[in-house]
């Protein structure tokens, strides 16, 4: 009838694992279909993967890209109340940090940015989102590192610098595990020291630290 399928024979553990893996892949593909990526800003720092063809994403993955200007975030950030800021400090920051961040303008703007983005993605029902951050918000208001870290901690798929390939990967991984996902790039592998160096942009779920 024209449907793609895979034939698997046997009852050993390897065969069962093949069936399980294929089933999970099918479920993920179906879940990815008809999802929406919220895109705040444009390509960050000249990244090639910061550009995406909406028609191709819809054709290949069934994913819609819905763009928003960064000004929407700034407007929402200005509307955040002091009570909301204190709630984040007590319930999101305090449980994960041994020392509270400085009580200054930078910290307040970072929290406001987080709350603004969270409100917008909930209002628009985005399934995942990308954000430019550099250049743009980070220069004019605050870096998105805290925002991204808290979103990853809560299992919300996201990527900075409008990296569309990255956010798709985070979405898939987030649906395969209950644990927070970390995204980073391999910088180097030191075989003698047996060390792999992975770099990111400051975004990491705090529960993964230590």
Q: What are the residue ranges of the model-derived segments?
A:
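Cofactor- and metal-binding active-site motifs of prokaryotic enzymes
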Residues: 1-33, 45-46, 195-199
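Short, surface-exposed connector motifs at secondary-structure boundaries
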Residues: 2-4, 34-38, 151-154
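Conserved beta-strand scaffold positions in the cores of enzyme catalytic domains, especially
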Residues: 5-7, 65-67, 158
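Catalytic cores of large soluble enzymes that bind and process phosphate-bearing ligands
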Residues: 7, 11-14, 49, 102-105, ...
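Conserved beta-strand termini and adjacent loop/short-helix elements that scaffold enzyme active sites
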Residues: 8-10, 40, 68-71, 184-186
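A short acidic, often aromatic-flanked loop/helix-cap motif at beta-alpha or helix-coil junctions
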Residues: 11-17, 71-77, 189-191
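A charged, amphipathic alpha-helical module
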Residues: 26-142
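Anaerobic metallocofactor- and corrinoid-dependent redox/one-carbon enzyme cores
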Residues: 54-56, 60, 64, 109-210
């Amino acid at each position: 009838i024209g449907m793609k399928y895979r034939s698997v024979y046997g009852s050993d553990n390897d065969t069962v694992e093949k069936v399980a893996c294929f089933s999970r892949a099918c479920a993920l593909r179906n879940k990815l279909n008809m999802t929406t990526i919220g895109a705040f800003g444009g390509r960050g720092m000249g990244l090639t993967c910061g550009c995406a063809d909406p028609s191709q994403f819809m054709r290949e993955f069934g994913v819609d890209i819905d763009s928003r200007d960064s000004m929407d975030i700034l407007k929402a950030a200005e509307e955040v109340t002091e009570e909301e800021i204190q709630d984040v400090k007590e319930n999101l920051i305090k449980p994960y940090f041994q020392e509270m961040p400085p009580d200054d303008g930078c910290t307040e703007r970072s929290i406001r940015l987080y709350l603004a983005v969270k409100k917008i993605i909930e209002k628009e029902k985005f399934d995942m989102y990308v954000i430019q951050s550099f250049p743009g918000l980070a220069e004019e208001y605050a870096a998105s590192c805290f925002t991204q870290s808290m979103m990853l901690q809560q299992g919300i798929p996201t990527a900075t610098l409008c990296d569309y390939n990255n956010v798709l990967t985070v979405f898939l991984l987030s649906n395969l595990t209950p644990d927070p996902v970390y995204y980073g790039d391999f910088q180097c592998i030191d075989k003698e020291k047996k060390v792999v160096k992975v770099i990111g942009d400051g975004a990491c779920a705090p529960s993964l630290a230590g």
